[in-house]
């Protein structure tokens, strides 16, 4: 007789009450990723343009970044999040719309900081496109 499959006892997602935290918006030309953490840096919720249902070139659009930010904010508000500090990184199109979407979802933004890394003449950039 075959053995009955035993239920794995993995770590269950518990509901925490986190009133304030940080939101990291990584916006590249191809995608936008929004991660919301508590003050210690432990991830509470995240969403990307790809996880929000966009594929291909549509992932780099401002609307995709807005949808991802709304999705991440909704899950963070369910955990009790009220105030966030926003860290924006990258050159993508969805930077401003993601910040507006976080504000529109009901989160109070206390600080906006641009943490895009800028090289002091580091690696050679890719060659220019000729279309």
Swiss-Prot record:
One of its GO terms (cellular component) is ribonucleoprotein complex. Keywords: Ribonucleoprotein, Ribosomal protein, RNA-binding, rRNA-binding. Disulfide bonds: none annotated. Residues 1-20 are annotated as: Disordered. One of its GO terms (biological process) is translation. InterPro entries: Ribosomal_uS11, Ribosomal_uS11_bac-type, Ribosomal_uS11_CS, Ribosomal_uS11_sf. Residues 1-16 have a biased composition (Basic residues). One of its GO terms (molecular function) is rRNA binding. HAMAP family: Ribosomal_uS11. Located on the platform of the 30S subunit, it bridges several disparate RNA helices of the 16S rRNA. Forms part of the Shine-Dalgarno cleft in the 70S ribosome. PANTHER family: 40S RIBOSOMAL PROTEIN S14/30S RIBOSOMAL PROTEIN S11. Part of the 30S ribosomal subunit. Interacts with proteins S7 and S18. Binds to IF-3. Belongs to the universal ribosomal protein uS11 family. This is Small ribosomal subunit protein uS11. It comes from Nostoc punctiforme (strain ATCC 29133 / PCC 73102).
